[in-house]
Amino acid sequence: MELLCCEGTRHAPRAGPDPRLLGDQRVLQSLLRLEERYVPRASYFQCVQKEIKPHMRKMLAYWMLEVCEEQRCEEDVFPLAMNYLDRYLSCVPTRKAQLQLLGTVCLLLASKLRETTPLTIEKLCIYTDQAVAPWQLREWEVLVLGKLKWDLAAVIAHDFLALILHRLSLPSDRQALVKKHAQTFLALCATDYTFAMYPPSMIATGSIGAAVLGLGACSMSADELTELLAGITGTEVDCLRACQEQIEAALRESLREAAQTAPSPVPKAPRGSSSQGPSQTSTPTDVTAIHL
């Protein structure tokens, strides 16, 4: 007897883009007014934290990103979790032994807000190799919520992507690819503390600019595109250009690190043999697939 499994990949129901909502200037202006509320005011490594260092934050961020990729989370779950992490660390001194616990709680909260089916406590504990117990997650969930004043609906860079792309009027066959590359840049920025105090709109605008120029998705020059993007979000041209250059530099550094740690190449399969490609996820394109 043969059994056939017809179960497909889990897909969350999605609403189609609303041109009136995307084109309404009040929506963009509302996000621009609110974004500063969710940006850390100063470097917490200098003012608040004594044990935690920038490289520890980066290691935690990469682990959190891997969890999101494994669980095929929505692309805005990881940046939102990093926003919670930075806001908490900017006001509460934390021991380095508690850092993974804090990151796990932030993932739990972000998935509850942005996922159709949130990550479970049990599953997150497995990802920590049982270093975090379920009761710790529950206790710290309440603690983090209190320190964030229950204000979880943070404005992040991902919220600006659709609004900016709608105003760029790119060719329809390039929009999806530009958005996917921009999402990769946003995930990369979230792992780097250098961008933690940048306004989300500037990070989103710089990521889209880097993606458009890297893909050659429009006929405008780099200066013309930068001026157009700066006008959309009301950003100073020089600041936006510096942010975009910093994003591209972070990408080059990430590619260099990936090349150093890359495994040896796998021999090609004999001709005629079939191999199953990786399934599509809702997480961004891998950073090694980006070309400037």
Curated annotation (Swiss-Prot):
GO terms for molecular function: cyclin-dependent protein serine/threonine kinase activator activity; cyclin-dependent protein serine/threonine kinase activity; protein kinase binding. GO terms for cellular component: cyclin D3-CDK4 complex; cyclin D3-CDK6 complex; cytoplasm; nucleoplasm; nucleus. Signal peptide: none annotated. Residues 272-285 have a biased composition (Low complexity). The modification Phosphothreonine is found at residue 283. The modification Phosphoserine is found at residues 264, 279. GO terms for biological process: cell division; G1/S transition of mitotic cell cycle; negative regulation of transcription by RNA polymerase II; regulation of cell cycle; regulation of cell population proliferation; signal transduction; T cell proliferation. Residues 256-292 are annotated as: Disordered. Interacts with the CDK4 and CDK6 protein kinases to form a serine/threonine kinase holoenzyme complex. The cyclin subunit imparts substrate specificity to the complex. Interacts with ATF5. Interacts with EIF3K. Component of the ternary complex cyclin D/CDK4/CDKN1B required for nuclear translocation and modulation of CDK4-mediated kinase activity. Can form similar complexes with either CDKN1A or CDKN2A. Regulatory component of the cyclin D3-CDK4 (DC) complex that phosphorylates and inhibits members of the retinoblastoma (RB) protein family including RB1 and regulates the cell-cycle during G(1)/S transition. Phosphorylation of RB1 allows dissociation of the transcription factor E2F from the RB/E2F complex and the subsequent transcription of E2F target genes which are responsible for the progression through the G(1) phase. Hypophosphorylates RB1 in early G(1) phase. Cyclin D-CDK4 complexes are major integrators of various mitogenenic and antimitogenic signals. Belongs to the cyclin family. Cyclin D subfamily. This is G1/S-specific cyclin-D3.
